[in-house]
Amino acid sequence: MQQIDEHSNKNRLKVVLAEQNKSGKWLALQLGKTENTISRWVRNINQPTVEQLFDIAKILNVDVKTLLNSNCD
């Protein structure tokens, strides 16, 4: 089984949503995506496209850099 640590996360979507008291369900509705898609992004199983990251940043009123983990290799 592969062990995943916090530094392997490519995005900070889970953190930013929590900071804003927003849910994955709410974001899914805003983006017209399924809750499953958002869940996979939040858990860093899949990643949103660059265009989707910019859409998310706009919806959450944050700089797109806020959504990215600067510790990625």
Task: Report each predicted region and the residues it spans.
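Residues within the alpha-helical elements of helix-turn-helix
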Residues: 19, 30, 59
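Recognition helix of helix-turn-helix/homeodomain-like DNA-binding domains
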Residues: 33-48
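Short alpha-helical "recognition helix" segments of helix-turn-helix
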Residues: 27-28, 56
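Residues in the helix-turn-helix
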Residues: 26, 37, 66
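DNA major-groove recognition helix of helix-turn-helix/homeodomain DNA-binding modules
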Residues: 51-66
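Helix-turn-helix DNA-binding elements, focusing on the entry/boundary residues of the two helices
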Residues: 24, 35, 50-53
